[in-house]
């Protein structure tokens, strides 16, 4: 199995305001990324899953990653 890099875009609602977000993750499947987003944003911002809206999940090349940690981990392999 190959670990892929995904970019996730969406919004979440906190205190009545919508906040856009863009995150990058390394995972095996798109379903794993979806769970990581819900877990990460939910725990950091205390937002329930029903207030997190994922607009897109796209697979990107490791070189295109903007997050330096994701890029470095992906390119070291």
UniProtKB/Swiss-Prot annotation:
<keyword id="KW-0699">rRNA-binding</keyword>
<comment type="similarity">
    <text>Belongs to the eukaryotic ribosomal protein eL20 family.</text>
</comment>
<comment type="subunit">
    <text>Part of the 50S ribosomal subunit. Binds 23S rRNA.</text>
</comment>
<keyword id="KW-0689">Ribosomal protein</keyword>
<dbReference type="InterPro" id="IPR023573">
    <property type="entry name" value="Ribosomal_eL20_dom"/>
</dbReference>
<dbReference type="GO" id="GO:0006412">
    <property type="term" value="P:translation"/>
</dbReference>
<dbReference type="GO" id="GO:0003735">
    <property type="term" value="F:structural constituent of ribosome"/>
</dbReference>
<keyword id="KW-0687">Ribonucleoprotein</keyword>
<protein>
    <recommendedName>
        <fullName>Large ribosomal subunit protein eL20</fullName>
    </recommendedName>
</protein>
<dbReference type="GO" id="GO:0070180">
    <property type="term" value="F:large ribosomal subunit rRNA binding"/>
</dbReference>
<dbReference type="Pfam" id="PF01775">
    <property type="entry name" value="Ribosomal_L18A"/>
</dbReference>
<dbReference type="GO" id="GO:1990904">
    <property type="term" value="C:ribonucleoprotein complex"/>
</dbReference>
<dbReference type="GO" id="GO:0005840">
    <property type="term" value="C:ribosome"/>
</dbReference>
<dbReference type="InterPro" id="IPR028877">
    <property type="entry name" value="Ribosomal_eL20"/>
</dbReference>
<keyword id="KW-0694">RNA-binding</keyword>
């Amino acid at each position: 199995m190959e670990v892929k890099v995904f970019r996730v875009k969406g919004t979440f609602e906190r205190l009545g305001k919508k906040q856009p977000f863009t995150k990058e993750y390394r995972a095996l499947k798109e379903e794993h990324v979806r769970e990581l987003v819900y877990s990460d944003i939910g725990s950091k911002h205390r937002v329930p899953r029903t207030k997190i809206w994922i607009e897109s999940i796209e697979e990107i090349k490791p070189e295109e990653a903007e997050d330096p940690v994701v890029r470095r981990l992906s390119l070291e392999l």
